[in-house]
């Protein structure tokens, strides 16, 4: 089991040398590797327990920033390889992971969109395909490179069974930079407003 902390650009002032935006892509290529990127402290605890009980390799990705509690509903249940539907919608499906789940939910509230908190590997193909069939459009949101991460995993799942337009929101093909975490998330359009604007443009 591998636990990685301070992932993504939200490490902030530590800068590009400390910002890992490629780790998920690297880990996805390892056979049998399970990748978990919890959205809040509730899910983080559930992920640690699931990793401990799982008989195989697991990569746990933890962010640095404090995030809102999302998974505090009485019916919340974490399962490896299963996404959690946080909001029902009809116009577009937003699939997010890690700290970007809160940004995605903020955008989804304004856009009448589905909101799904996803494990990355194994990806919940059944849930994602069903949601894509319902809305006809999918957006992925992650604090990671748009190359090889959640967006790529979702595209892999949809390509054969439900090819629909997909917008991948994340760090483009660039290195990070130094700055306050909130400012960097805004610059890379990974905060709630940035996600909202990109999804709105995609849905025109």
At which residue positions do the language-model features occur?
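Thiamine diphosphate
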Residues: 11-12, 63-204
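Conserved thiamine diphosphate
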Residues: 1-93
């Amino acid at each position: 089991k591998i636990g990685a902390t301070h992932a993504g650009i939200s490490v902030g002032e530590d800068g590009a040398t400390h910002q890992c935006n490629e780790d998920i892509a690297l880990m996805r290529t390892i056979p049998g590797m399970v990748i978990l990127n919890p959205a809040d402290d509730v899910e983080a605890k559930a992920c640690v327990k699931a990793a401990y009980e799982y008989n195989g390799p697991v990569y746990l990705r933890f962010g640095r920033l404090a995030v809102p509690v999302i998974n505090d509903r009485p019916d919340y249940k974490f399962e490896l390889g299963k996404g959690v539907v946080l909001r029902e919608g009809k116009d577009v499906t937003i699939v997010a992971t890690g700290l970007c789940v809160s940004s995605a939910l903020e955008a989804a509230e304004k856009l009448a969109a589905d909101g799904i908190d996803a494990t990355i590997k194994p990806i919940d193909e059944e849930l994602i395909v069903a949601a894509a069939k319902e809305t006809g459009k999918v957006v992925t949101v992650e604090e990671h490179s748009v190359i090889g991460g959640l967006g790529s995993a979702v595209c892999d799942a949809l390509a054969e069974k439900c090819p629909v337009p997909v917008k991948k929101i994340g760090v483009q093909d660039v290195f990070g930079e130094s700055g306050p975490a909130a400012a960097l998330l805004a610059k890379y359009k990974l905060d709630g407003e940035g996600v909202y604007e990109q999804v709105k443009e995609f849905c025109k």
